[in-house]
A protein has these predicted regions:
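Extreme N-terminal signal-anchor transmembrane helix of membrane signaling/transducer proteins, especially
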Residues: 1-8, 168-186
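Extracytoplasmic
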Residues: 87, 97-163
Length: 191
């Protein structure tokens, strides 16, 4: 029972993280929609609308410095929230250390109206060269044929799961001890 509970807990925690990322992409997509509508209304030129949308998405942050990125349909970075040096580079062939072609997966999966979740590993930052597990969600914005995405590291997810598992184990142990004590006392009372 405890094993099944732990598997269910892990799946639930992962699903919550996935949904959080999905909702954040929906927010960024709505922001881009605002600028696309301004272009359709004639308030902005197409070029000005695109630049404003990319600047707005690039400036968005959440959680612990997580950011958004925008790719064109071919995999070229058109905006990146933390590394502007990537803008203009085609990352379609990029792979993580395990050989996962994560950008190609995003490009392919983002064609779905629901978007796509991709799992891969990537260095967490300049101070941490070791690749860490990450999940990203990406969705196509049809107006400008952009792929809007963001990824979150899940190393903290593993730590949170271990803490929850230990709490569950502790609770189970207390329940077992109480039931054992009650059974022992009941057995003595009957004899």
């Amino acid at each position: 029972v405890a094993g099944l509970s732990l598997m269910t807990l892990r799946a639930q925690m992962f699903s919550e993280r996935q949904n959080q990322t999905r909702h954040l992409i929906e927010t960024a997509t709505t922001l881009v929609d605002h600028y696309a509508q301004a272009v359709r209304d004639g308030a902005l030129s197409d070029d000005a609308g695109r630049k404003a949308a990319l600047a707005a998405v690039s400036s968005l942050r959440y959680s612990d410095g997580e950011y958004f990125f925008v790719l064109d349909h071919a995999g070229t970075v058109v905006a990146h929230g933390v590394d502007p040096r990537l803008v203009g580079k085609n990352l379609k062939e990029a792979k993580d250390q395990n050989g996962v072609a994560f950008v190609a997966q995003m490009l392919e999966g983002a064609r779905s109206p629901d978007g796509v979740t991709v799992r891969y590993v990537w260095p967490k930052g300049k101070g941490s060269p070791e690749p860490m597990p990450k999940i990203a969600f990406a969705k196509r914005h049809p107006g400008w044929d952009w792929i809007i995405g963001s990824g979150v590291y899940v190393d903290d997810f593993d730590r949170a799961f271990v803490v929850a598992a230990l709490q569950m184990a502790g609770t189970s142990l207390v329940v077992i001890l109480l039931l054992g004590t009650a059974a022992s006392l009941l057995g003595r009372a009957i004899v």
